[in-house]
């Protein structure tokens, strides 16, 4: 998982989700696109 100060969608299938006050990017087709903000 990449930890970044600002997260952006890399791929069309990326989904931005807010969990426990943190923003995450999840992608079931390409798990290497996972990101977390902060």
Curated annotation (Swiss-Prot):
One of its GO terms (molecular function) is structural constituent of ribosome. Keywords: Ribonucleoprotein, Ribosomal protein. GO terms for biological process: translation. One of its GO terms (cellular component) is ribosome. It comes from the Bacteria. Pfam families: Ribosomal_L36. PANTHER family: 50S RIBOSOMAL PROTEIN L36 2 (PTHR47781), LARGE RIBOSOMAL SUBUNIT PROTEIN BL36B (PTHR47781:SF1). HAMAP family: Ribosomal_bL36. Belongs to the bacterial ribosomal protein bL36 family. This is Large ribosomal subunit protein bL36A. The gene is rpmJ1.
């Amino acid at each position: 998982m990449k930890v970044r100060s600002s997260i952006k969608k890399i791929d069309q299938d990326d989904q931005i989700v807010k969990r426990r006050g943190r923003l995450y990017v999840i992608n079931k087709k390409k798990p290497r696109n996972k990101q977390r903000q902060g």
